[in-house]
Amino acid sequence: VELEVPKEGMTINYSYQIEQNQIIIRKEWDSFPRRLFLSGNSKKKYQIKDCWKNIPEQLYYYSSAFTEALLAHPDRAEIPPCHRKGLVIKAYAPRINKDYCLAICGNQKALGNWDPDKAIPMSDANFPEWQIELDASKLKFPLEYKFILYHKEEKKADCWENNPNRYLADPELKTNETLVISDRYAYFDIPVWKGAGIAIPVFSLKSENSFGVGDFGDLKRMIDWAVSTQQKVIQILPINDTTMTHAWTDSYPYNSISIYAFHPMYADIKQMGTLKDKSAAAKFNKKQKELNGLPAMDYEAVNQTKWEYFRLIFKQEGEKVLASGEFGEFFNANKEWLQPYAVFSYLRDAFQTPNFREWPRHSVYNAQDIEKMCRPESVDYPHIALYYYIQFHLHLQLVAATKYAREHGVVLKGDIPIGISRNSVEAWTEPYYFNLNGQAGAPPDDFSVNGQNWGFPTYNWDVMEKDGYRWWMKRFQKMSEYFDAYRIDHILGFFRIWEIPMHAVHGLLGQFIPSIPMSREEIESYGLPFREEYLIPYIHESFLGQVFGPHTDYVKQTFLLPAETPGVYHMKPEFTTQREVESFFAGKNDENSLWIRDGLYTLISDVLFVPDTKEKDKYHPRIGIQRDFIFRSLNEQEQNAFNRLYDQYYYHRHNEFWRQQAMKKLPQLTQSTRMLVCGEDLGMIPDCVSSVMNDLRILSLEIQRMPKNPMHEFGYLNEYPYRSVCTISTHDMSTLRGWWEEDYLQTQRYYNTMLGHYGTAPTVATPELCEEVVRNHLKSNSILCILSLQDWLSIDGKWRNPNVQEERINVPSNPRNYWRYRMHLTLEQLMKAEELNDKIRELIKYTGRAPKK
């Protein structure tokens, strides 16, 4: 390859791929590209000896979480000087913190004559790749050398690499030739890196400056606390805008209207400027104290008040800000999503609905029409520009928090929701990417016995594949501007998604998409004669009283019709679906109405098979049917036959098929950025998931009360894989203290078997018990142990919340959960809680999660 190089030299990045007939058949791992520094000498020739790069086993060390924060080298060395006859030696050594560097030592004077204190430091200009250019004219061949871990300040060797001497025969270089030897790896006897962190939603943060909700300014204060306690990661929930109706139901952080825009409530209004109107400023100061004094977030009051402030500060400062060069850069970089989002938000409020299908105008997205609305001379522009202004400030504030975190060696870990709202900017502007006639959810699990119905549309992966998953690539790349690690919510959705028909409320009537449905002949091959009755709800006199109690007669009269078979009933035509039943009971929230409604949902889902959504005369066994009445109506032979096909269908049939589906998407998506990737792999997990995550070096999630081994009631912390995130509880679960009080018998077993205590378990989780559980988790094998703030505070009787019920963030079985949990103390108080902070520091240090190297 011949290149024209400027006199000052240049840098090139490159990687390798294999092509056949101009078609790429294989690419090497290139998330961290090779970098070559070229001399400005026009006569220069380079001989390059590279090795094909597969994905590194220790991929996490190459992530921006490590290279930009945890093991960052902020003061990079200069590009190594060039020689007329050069030998460039490169090596990867990512597990070296800023106090150390890689050095080279060898069998001659130019390399220190094997004296480690005379080793030659290498350049970290392309960290975590180290390199040095030696003057080959001063070298004697054959050359022998080794790499050394070298302390920069003390200027002495710390340890030699774990390898035999490296050997290089005479390359017979001529003047103006340079040999580049790369893709070497240096390994040292350094303990594996482990860290601890905290998980807390941004809305839950509380400082003395908060406005009734946590904001991006509060993130800096949380970073300060993390640093003071030697925690390395702050994990948050999604922060995208979820504004639909401006009601508390918008508090659900996973139902965003944009995958790019941030929720306006996260703006720190103090950073946006001070109102010149002193009476208005005084009013907001008073409101701030009122809202911040509440034990939980008042979503509606917070957002209403902040929006009043946004309008006033925009009127005062907007014109100047929008004319600034910094805003111009932001706008040009984000125009593609910012304009549709701003217009969508404006029209949502103007037409008083987020359902764009109901808008009298612009219900079908037209880019040219939107462009006209966004022109400064448009009558709509002032309303639209307000959203530009808010998003610009949110961007500045989060970028500042990210920079602050990196400077202090802390990783901000974001959250990528698996779904989007069907009433969102993306559904409006790019409907071809989604299946809007279905609902995404999850099959039954420990979180919800009826499964979960998230209401999101599912993805049209066939369309996404055609453009190389551009939609996802842009999403990940945008996220990498703010985060160095992220959690893939429901990573199973990249293998298959649980799709629920629009007429269903619960998740039980769903089916996996994509999947391989069963024909009637295949069902019968298991010994179960197929009958049409298996497709309709089984409703029999014998169990109606069990379901409805004193309401049985009312249910028969109002919702059921007798069938020809004595004792058997069908649903009336107007109540054949769960949505029809839901509509009938809309607004009726008394105990009896909910009892009857939920009982009818149970009847409607009592089918043995669910028809496939695409292939006629193909079926799926209904998930979890063994607990329901239609299964009990089968004889023993039929039950055994059904269980055989059920086991084959759900646990074996799709393993290779789903693996192929995931490997189409996940490799290029997870490698599109250098963020550290963590997968939420809970629930009904196919066997193929762990192997794919292992192949792609994705961190798993490990929770002791949700073990991956179905034969265990609790997970064994010492068996957790190193490449994992360990936690006690997630936002979808009760906290440690809450769980302790939920099921006394289970708690007793945990107390005796996992904690190894004799006798009767305490009825509440004492600070001492909580500290023991926390310590055990910190001692696990996992690279990261990230605990919720509530679980960290549980170890101290003085600082834990007196009311354990206030600590729960979400109840997945409740589709109308109010996401409003806030810290019961301020971040300023937390910083001053010396005994608690000392205890956390000691726990982290004692368990090896405060590495010095």
Which residue stretches match the model-derived regions?
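S-adenosyl-L-methionine-dependent DNA methyltransferase catalytic core
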Residues: 40-41, 819
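Residues at beta-strand starts and edge strands
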Residues: 10-12, 83-87, 100, 128-130, ...
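Intrinsically disordered, low-complexity linker/tail regions enriched in polar/charged residues
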Residues: 51, 58-61, 65-113, 124, ...
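Aromatic-rich carbohydrate-binding modules that target alpha-glucans
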Residues: 1-11, 17-40, 93-142, 150-173, ...
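Long, highly charged low-complexity segments
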Residues: 44-48
